[in-house]
């Protein structure tokens, strides 16, 4: 099986026409710089930037193809984190996180797990440790541990209740891989079966209607704008824990300039013929919040496409640099 990569990219289709609104000082210039940074990239791209109006600054809104559902890979892990913390929402949530032991064994082992390193580690770990591994290192075994604790149906119920209709999560990362490989029993796909499938081809597209990791730029901006402000939590202590974990996101040091408080979890995939990159975030900069999502899905025959990945990251850094300059 082709490697699943947190740093990959995904694709599909021609670039769609875009709709843009931009308001605020330098709005038209910012629009050109942000959208222009991504011009020429292959496949389908989507972007949204929203900075709510403040007492002294008008709203900034820039969108491109923001309502289209695309593959976002591990960026769905922020949904899982949020729902699980909602379930634990209480003034003593920090104690609950450190006191909840989660099983680390073959029932949850998955590929691309650099922290829990299956099959070499077994036992129990605290739920906090699993959450941090899921966000900081995008560990898929940790993800399946937290997803099991939350319940995939509960995560889907949360997304539906929040109006995030373009967002979808699988039963587990391992079930997702089983479906990609065409396993008839993908919902009960075992670690042994996954290991035995190492050289088998991908037969189902990562973006599908059965087991996928998907969202839209609209949904991601809505989710980040609401979750980091505490809309989904009843207790301030839970919001603190959510922000603490999300501030560990592995994409932050890869893409974002210094100077802001960033809460983000990126995602991607690289398989032969299909690639994706997604970076959503909430950023507090110069006493102002902005919310951002940039997604690209594309097709390339090779298992990896480092040239397009490098172009996307350069575009992302240029766009974020322009946004930081505008808000600072």
Where are these regions (language model features)?
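Second-shell loop/turn segments in exported
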Residues: 64-71, 115-121, 129-133, 141-146, ...
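Active-site SXXK
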Residues: 71-102, 292
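Short, glycine/proline-biased beta-turn/loop segments that scaffold the active-site neighborhood
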Residues: 90-122
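Active-site-adjacent helix/loop patches that line small-molecule binding or acyl-intermediate pockets
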Residues: 26-30, 106, 121-201, 217-218, ...
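Beta-lactamase-like hydrolase cores
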Residues: 20-71, 319-322
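N-terminal secretory signal peptides and thylakoid transit peptides that target proteins
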Residues: 1-15
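Structured C-terminal helix/loop/strand segments within mature extracytoplasmic catalytic/sensor domains
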Residues: 26-34, 212-328
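Bacterial peptidoglycan biogenesis and beta-lactam-recognition machinery
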Residues: 40, 44, 85-99, 150-156, ...
């Amino acid at each position: 099986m082709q490697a699943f990569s947190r740093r990959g990219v995904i694709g599909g289709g021609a670039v769609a026409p875009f709709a843009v609104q931009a308001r605020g000082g330098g709005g038209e210039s910012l629009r050109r710089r942000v959208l222009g940074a991504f011009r020429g990239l292959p496949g389908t791209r989507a972007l949204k930037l929203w900075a709510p109006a403040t007492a002294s600054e008008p709203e900034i809104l820039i969108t491109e193809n923001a309502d289209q559902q695309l593959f976002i890979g591990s960026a769905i892990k922020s949904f899982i984190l949020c729902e699980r913390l909602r379930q634990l929402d209480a003034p003593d949530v920090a104690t609950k996180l450190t006191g909840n032991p989660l099983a680390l064994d073959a029932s949850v082992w998955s590929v691309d797990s650099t922290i829990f390193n299956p099959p070499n580690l077994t036992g129990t770990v605290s739920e906090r440790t699993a959450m941090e591994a899921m966000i900081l290192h995008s560990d898929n075994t940790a993800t399946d541990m937290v997803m099991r604790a939350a319940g995939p149906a509960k995560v889907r119920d949360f997304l539906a209740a929040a109006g995030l209709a373009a967002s979808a999560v699988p039963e587990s990362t391992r079930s997702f891989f089983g479906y990609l490989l065409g396993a008839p029993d993908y919902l009960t796909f075992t670690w042994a079966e996954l290991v035995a499938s190492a050289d088998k081809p991908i037969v189902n597209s990562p973006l599908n209607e059965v087991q996928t990791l998907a969202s839209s730029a609209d949904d991601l901006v809505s989710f980040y704008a609401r979750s980091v402000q505490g809309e989904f939590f009843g207790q301030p202590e839970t919001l603190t824990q959510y922000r603490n974990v999300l501030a560990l996101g592995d994409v932050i040091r890869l893409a974002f300039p210094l100077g802001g408080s960033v809460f983000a979890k990126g995602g991607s995939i690289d398989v032969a013929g299909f690639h994706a990159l997604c970076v959503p975030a909430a950023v507090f900069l110069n006493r102002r919040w902005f919310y951002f999502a940039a997604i690209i899905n594309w097709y390339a025959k090779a298992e990896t496409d480092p040239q397009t990945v490098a172009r996307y990251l350069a575009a992302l850094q240029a766009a974020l640099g322009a946004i930081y300059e505008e808000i600072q």
